[in-house]
Swiss-Prot record:
The gene is hemA. NADP(+) binds at residues 177-182. Belongs to the glutamyl-tRNA reductase family. Keywords: NADP, Oxidoreductase, Porphyrin biosynthesis. It catalyses: (S)-4-amino-5-oxopentanoate + tRNA(Glu) + NADP(+) = L-glutamyl-tRNA(Glu) + NADPH + H(+). GO terms for biological process: protoporphyrinogen IX biosynthetic process from glutamate. It comes from Clostridium kluyveri (strain ATCC 8527 / DSM 555 / NBRC 12016 / NCIMB 10680 / K1). It is an enzyme of class 1 (oxidoreductase). One of its GO terms (molecular function) is glutamyl-tRNA reductase activity. This is Glutamyl-tRNA reductase.
């Protein structure tokens, strides 16, 4: 049974980060939960943490097990939601199309789902029905993005931050962290009127040479970042660090705008004690986007039929998949019938006319199933179920 435990969307970032799972511990958590409940995938982004499982555990037992396995504080259980079956399937399809993103319609989530799927594959914690569901969700998200053409309206958090930086006419800034979000920021800001863009990374040797060719870009060591704070007007922090990397004692006495795009947060809230610092977190940034939200909502609603089609297809597949054991049993039985007749043919092919022997074997196989069908018809007639039985037998044997 497909089940989902997730964090309620209205939770603020302070609560969300208590449930976040960093990439460094993801594989270990996947394997541990897999041992406890069965097939599992963990989707953990800056805006959501969702645990998808295919398990027969009942709701409370599953929630207790997941909280224990992920070392979550059970006092926070009121902040989670639980859904299963078609509701969990529908939720995932909506997530893949951007319907549940804080920035409505942003397409980063599709890449994040693919990353989560790859991580579960790598950890060998996903198979069967859950694997098929995520394959379907990724296909659904791609189709929705292509047909809806949501890419024509930049809606990712990095694009909104870049737009705000440009609107503020900030010319000197630092990006801390150069993962996917940092690289997107670089993409949006590289062609701006910036004077200097410092990019702080932990390993300078991993920076591709193509990035170093941009004149106004300067890559610096993460450990040296503080020595450059006096030279900039803005910091965008987007690392995957488990602890805070900036506190008020690190900052100079100059006007600074800081965007914290990390979950868990990179910036200690004590920086708000400084009159010269303006801090934006993920929740603040989401509010900035309200102007275009109505336009995207209308456009996305027009193409909702795409995800409805994918939901229907998966539910139909799921129902048919439940027949797999019976189908295999019928096939095995058929193979046994054929094998007996093949053995008979091999034993007699040198002693009898082969044409007559083949005809006899084929007729014998047909009679076997016809006689069995007749027996079932008689049994069901006596049990008062002949009408449905006759309908099925006619559908199988008669054109």
């Amino acid at each position: 049974m497909i089940q989902l435990i997730g964090i309620k969307s209205q939770c603020d970032i302070g609560i969300r980060q208590k449930f976040s799972i960093t990439s460094e511990v993801l594989e270990g958590k996947l394997k541990y939960i897999n041992e406890l409940v069965g097939s599992v995938l963990i989707l953990s982004t800056c805006n959501r943490t969702e645990i998808y499982v295919d398990s027969n555990l009942e709701e409370k037992k599953l929630i207790d097990t997941v909280f224990y396995g992920l070392d979550w504080d059970y006092d926070l259980v009121s902040y989670i939601f639980y859904i299963k079956d078609k509701y969990a399937i529908k939720h995932l399809m909506e997530v893949s199309c951007g319907f549940h993103s804080k920035i409505l319609g942003e397409d980063q989530i599709l890449g994040q789902i693919k990353t989560a799927y790859d991580a579960a594959l790598e950890a060998k914690t996903i198979k069967g029905k859950l694997q098929r569901l995520f394959q379907k969700a990724i296909t659904c998200g791609k189709e929705f993005k292509h047909i809806c053409e949501s890419y024509r309206i930049p809606v990712s958090i990095p694009s909104i931050v870049a737009k705000e930086i440009l609107n503020m006419d900030i010319r000197k800034y630092m990006i801390i962290g150069f993962g996917k979000i940092g690289q997107l920021l670089f993409k949006y800001l590289n062609n701006s009127q910036a004077q200097i863009i410092y990019i702080a990374v932990r390993d300078l040797n991993k920076v591709h040479d193509s990035y170093k060719k941009c004149g106004k870009i300067r890559f610096i060591s993460f450990k040296d970042r503080k020595s450059y704070y006096n030279d900039i007007d803005c910091i965008v922090s987007c690392t995957s660090a488990p602890d805070k990397i900036i506190s008020k004692g690190d900052l100079p006495c100059r006007k600074l705008t800081i965007f914290d795009l990390a979950v868990p947060e990179d910036i200690d809230r004590n920086v708000l004690d400084l009159d010269n610092v303006t801090l934006y977190d993920i929740d603040n940034i989401s509010v900035i986007d309200e102007k275009n939200k109505a336009i995207r909502k209308k456009t996305m609603g027009k193409y909702r039929y795409i995800l409805e089609n994918h939901i229907d297809k998966f539910i139909k597949w799921e129902k048919l998949h439940q027949l797999s054991p019976e189908i295999q049993k019928v096939k095995k039985y058929g193979d046994e019938i054929c094998e007996k007749r093949i053995t008979t043919f091999k034993n007699k092919k040198h002693t009898k006319d082969n044409d007559i022997l083949v005809k006899t074997m084929i007729e014998s196989t047909a009679r076997f199933y016809i006689n069995r069908a007749i027996e079932v018809m008689k049994e069901e007639k006596l049990n008062g179920r002949e009408e449905e039985c006759l309908r099925l037998i006619n559908k199988i044997f008669c054109k």
